[in-house]
């Protein structure tokens, strides 16, 4: 190869090495984002729950509940920086055959989040149950590269963010996950009018404070930020004017089903694979290939520099050259003879 071939290989190898460095530092952060077309349904179950039967205005115990949460991305409302989710949650009484009566609670939510940090952002007509509301903190996912620290996590029922504290690292569904816990201390979330008899009052209608408390535990795959398992110990009660709990609206320990955990684990593995491709596999391949090209190029350049052409032979001159004294062939030398008449005759012969 010519020297220029080696130089081209060195340049190409250098370019690949630069690409190997830039991919995890520049390219990956630009591509690793929360997807706009998010679509998932998670199912949680609770055993032996207590709920308020609004038909009979009495508590029912030993009830099995199922909660369905559907998350759908509003692609048109999202962009490079934000994703918008529409969320619906419905809790039903498994034992109630009448579909219209089996519903225990229902809620809707619309939230916009930063596609890189997963933090809520003020945008896009966000609301809770149709009423405009500004979210804060994390909502339905954790950030890529979740750390062992405390995050602010939004509670839709309390309508504020609470500290979700890192507790431990565990194994779940074949994944290493971070366990976070957050506590919603008892808080009044509304006031409603109810029959006085419900609160033990003789009045026909009374005001009742609706109170809420929750202990939420989340198991998060740290690379992807996917919540592999969620669990809530939720309590809602009605209180009378003295602040005493009179009746339970819901008292349940809801947790992701095994199937939902497997579904979430698969989503985490898929996301982690894409992240690993951009942050590890591609940089390593580019770096090694670039290094090989540089080494080959340097070798070719050095070899070409050492193999300079020999000096061209000088063409023989057409004219004969005189022999050096040492090279002359010995020839017989004739001794000069003295002219007749001796020396004087010789002298006379000169003009």
Task: Describe the residue ranges of each PLM region.
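Juxtamembrane interface at the cytosolic side of transmembrane helices
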Residues: 2-5, 274-325
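Membrane-proximal low-complexity regions enriched in glycine and acidic/polar residues
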Residues: 139-231
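Extracellular or lumenal secretory-pathway regions
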Residues: 2-148, 254-279, 299-304
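Long, low-complexity, intrinsically disordered segments
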Residues: 323-351
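Solvent-exposed coil/turn segments that connect beta secondary-structure elements
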Residues: 46-48, 183-187, 235
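Short, cysteine-centered beta-strand-loop-beta hairpins and adjacent loop/turn segments enriched
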Residues: 92-98, 186-197, 208, 237-244
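Cytosolic juxtamembrane regulatory segments of multi-pass membrane proteins
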Residues: 48-55, 319-332
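Membrane-proximal extracellular "stem/stalk" segments
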Residues: 198-280
């Amino acid at each position: 190869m010519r020297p220029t071939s080696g130089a081209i290989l060195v340049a190409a190898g250098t370019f690949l090495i630069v690409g190997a460095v830039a991919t995890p530092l520049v390219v990956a952060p630009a591509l690793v984002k929360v997807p706009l077309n998010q679509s998932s349904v998670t199912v949680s179950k609770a055993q032996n729950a207590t709920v308020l039967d609004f038909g009979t205005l009495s508590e029912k115990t030993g009830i099995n509940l199922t909660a369905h949460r559907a998350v759908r991305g509003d692609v048109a409302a999202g962009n490079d920086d934000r994703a918008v989710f529409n969320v619906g949650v419905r809790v039903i009484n498994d034992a109630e055959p009448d579909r219209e009566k089996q519903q225990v609670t229902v809620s809707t939510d619309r939230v916009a989040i930063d596609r890189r940090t997963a933090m809520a952002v003020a945008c896009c007509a966000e609301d809770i149950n149709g009423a405009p509301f500004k979210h804060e903190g994390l909502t339905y996912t954790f950030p890529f590269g979740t750390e062992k620290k405390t995050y602010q996590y939004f509670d839709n029922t309390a309508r504020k963010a609470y500290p979700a504290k890192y507790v431990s690292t565990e194994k779940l569904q074949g994944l290493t996950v971070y366990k976070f816990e957050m506590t919603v201390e008892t808080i009044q979330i509304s006031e409603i009018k109810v029959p006085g008899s419900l609160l033990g009052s003789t009045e026909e209608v009374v005001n009742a404070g609706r109170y809420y408390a929750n202990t939420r535990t989340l198991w998060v795959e740290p690379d992807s930020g996917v919540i592999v398992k969620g669990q809530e110990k939720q309590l809602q009660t009605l209180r009378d004017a003295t602040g005493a709990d009179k009746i339970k609206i819901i008292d349940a320990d809801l947790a992701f089903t095994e199937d939902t955990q497997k579904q979430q684990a698969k989503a985490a593995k898929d996301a982690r694979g894409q992240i690993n491709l951009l942050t590890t596999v591609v940089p390593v391949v580019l770096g090694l290939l670039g290094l090989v090209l540089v080494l080959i190029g340097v070798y070719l350049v050095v070899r070409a520099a050492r193999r300079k052409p020999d000096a061209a032979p000088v063409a023989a001159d057409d004219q004969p050259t005189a022999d050096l004294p040492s090279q002359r062939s010995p020839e017989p030398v004739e001794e000069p003879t003295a002219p007749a008449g001796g020396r004087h005759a010789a002298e006379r012969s000169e003009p």
